[in-house]
């Protein structure tokens, strides 16, 4: 005779199941479990008196015989493809299976074999997401990487060489010598890393040199001169060598207007950074570019979401980042031309309708590297409060909105930059770069961060205590962040052309070098999952009002946000 449990008792023991709802942090976002892969009555759970014991939920199968290295039990998966409850099996640093774990000798429907060589991570009552990707990094200081890891990021893409003034302003690692030094430095960090070369040139030779030196992408930045000639040259090299191009356009409209930039792009795929414009770009109407089918638009997190303090902090931030002087009137005018409440408010709505595809940081260069997830979910919460349910929702939940927003910092940047064959989603065969969250701290403070199936970071109590929980509890690197485990648990992405040219042998780095792929004509705005809308955008040159397909886009600034001071008292 089967034993019946109440929903509350079941959720307390094994986590939520189909029909149960979970609140994300202190937001107004509620997700509902769409599917549960378990067999009721056959759930596996680790602990004293629990199921994963020899002859019960643990089989006699060896690793060679098919048992996984790690099982995450009864996890609530939140990804672009769905919100489901499942066990997750990890093997060889990758996601081996999603489904039902246990002992096939004693349990039905098992597709994840637990054996004597299997470690267990308790996922009951936890949320698991793919590791986040930040595709707009100024590599100003190496300490950013630890900050990013502890926030739930597992991949960082961008450019720089340290606190040089070129790096303070632009996401470029200029030249093959600097790129080589950065690839060598990558061995020191538990993080998947990728470096962008400088894309500003009117002749291809120096750009080709950087791609062959390991650049995964090329960055066009106005501070180096983003002219129509440079745009055309850079995209031509990218098309030949299969690397992405990111663009920060000409705020001052010196070499042309947004229409001239669109013409120079010639319909080729390009990733437009901070497409709203506060981070830089044709003033006041660069935001129009988000309606182009070949343009992948993204935001940086200082404008996410629009609040009563957004405008005030931007002026000083901009003056510092772009080497401007408050004593020069032209510099002040340059800065003020980029900061417009109307376009920032419209940016909120364009994210909510899926017209902006990616959210990133702009680390230490008008952006906060540890707040990519926080700012994403604050935007989602603000839009739910102001705009209500999305028309795409099918139940009494926010599942579609959550899937849309999680895609903005996981799968979509991975697709845009040719990394989605390795990272960006929680799918079988991809790298086991995972983040485990307590729902009450979702998006704010992870419970655990895995890189290549190895625990790289987690909050940890006093190491001298008798148990792991006594205060002070703070984030610490774990074993995956040390020694050869570090270099075997993460990778450095490079161009295929650089690998073909023998880069790995020349540099002799410890980390695996993995090539980016499919960054050009095979992708575009339509490839951005849940974020592919291409509305016709108009900007009033006098009032800066933004319209999408004729509809005015405006919203009030937030005065209070979730995931803020309540979580950072200490």
From Swiss-Prot:
Q: Share an example GO biological-process annotation for this protein.
A: urea catabolic process
Catalytic reaction equation(s): urea + 2 H2O + H(+) = hydrogencarbonate + 2 NH4(+)
Positions of the catalytic residues: 322 (proton donor)
Q: How is the cofactor bound?
A: Binds 2 nickel ions per subunit.
Q: Which GO terms describe its molecular function?
A: nickel cation binding; urease activity
Task: State any GO CC term.
Answer: cytoplasm
Family of this protein: Belongs to the metallo-dependent hydrolases superfamily. Urease alpha subunit family.
Q: Which Pfam families match?
A: Amidohydro_1, Urease_alpha
Q: What protein name is recorded for this chain?
A: Urease subunit alpha
Q: Where does Ni(2+) 2 bind?
A: 219, 248, 274
Name the needed cofactors: Ni cation
The scientific name of the source species is Sinorhizobium fredii (strain NBRC 101917 / NGR234)
Q: Which PANTHER family match?
A: UREASE
**Pathway where it operates:** Nitrogen metabolism; urea degradation; CO(2) and NH(3) from urea (urease route): step 1/1
